[in-house]
């Protein structure tokens, strides 16, 4: 049984109904429909915290999906799971791969910045201010890109850039 059929969440059910209607009326190939079904089931599993199941669905969606734009969102969601699991190196890899296919994902830039900022904080706790500054500088670059794509968003990041004199 498709995961979306067993999910009890109202929003997920609504999304599934709308997605199923769209799949019927929009001309798509069977492969595209199957890829979307895996993607939808991956999102459902991810929203419930079932990351292993979500990853399986996303990997299947990646195998079937050919559109670079759609692939970027699959890769982004895989990055989110790795971030949630504390696998920051893997997460950064998937965010990079998502941005290669779709450079207009401010949320990927933001998440990369958050990881870099976190690593900077870790370096400070370990007494390595030089490494910390390098991580903070990288975080600043990613936040600048996120802010450039969506002015008015990421207010806390914008304030951090101003306070740390990294905003030009």
From Swiss-Prot:
Predominant location of this chain? plastid
Cell compartments where the protein resides: Plastid, Chloroplast thylakoid membrane
State the annotated membrane topology for this chain: Peripheral membrane protein
GO biological process, any: photosynthesis
Q: Where are the TPR repeats?
A: 35-68, 72-105, 120-153
Q: Which domain of life is it from?
A: Eukaryota
The record's keywords, sorted A to Z, are: Chloroplast, Membrane, Photosynthesis, Plastid, Repeat, Thylakoid, TPR repeat
One cellular component term from this protein's GO annotations in UniProt: chloroplast thylakoid membrane
The record ties this protein, via Pfam families, to: TPR_1
Q: Does the keyword Membrane apply?
A: yes
Regarding protein family, the annotation reads: Belongs to the Ycf3 family.
Give the protein's function.
Essential for the assembly of the photosystem I (PSI) complex. May act as a chaperone-like factor to guide the assembly of the PSI subunits.
| Protein name in the entry | Photosystem I assembly protein Ycf3
């Amino acid at each position: 049984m498709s995961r979306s059929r067993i999910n009890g969440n109202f929003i997920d059910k609504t999304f599934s109904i709308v997605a199923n209607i769209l799949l019927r009326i929009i001309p798509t190939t069977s492969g595209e429909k199957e890829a979307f079904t895996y993607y939808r089931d991956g999102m459902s599993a991810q929203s419930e915290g079932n990351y292993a199941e979500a990853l399986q669905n996303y990997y299947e969606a990646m195998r079937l999906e050919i559109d670079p734009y759609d692939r970027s969102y699959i890769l982004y969601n895989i990055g989110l799971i790795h971030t949630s699991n504390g696998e920051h190196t893997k997460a950064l890899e998937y965010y990079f791969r998502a941005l290669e296919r779709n450079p207009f994902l401010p949320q990927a830039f933001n998440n990369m910045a958050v990881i870099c900022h976190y690593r900077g904080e870790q370096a400070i706790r370990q007494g390595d201010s030089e490494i910390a500054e390098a991580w903070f500088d990288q975080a600043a670059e990613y936040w600048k890109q996120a802010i450039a794509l969506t002015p008015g968003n990421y207010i806390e990041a914008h304030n951090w850039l101003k306070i740390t004199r990294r905003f030009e």
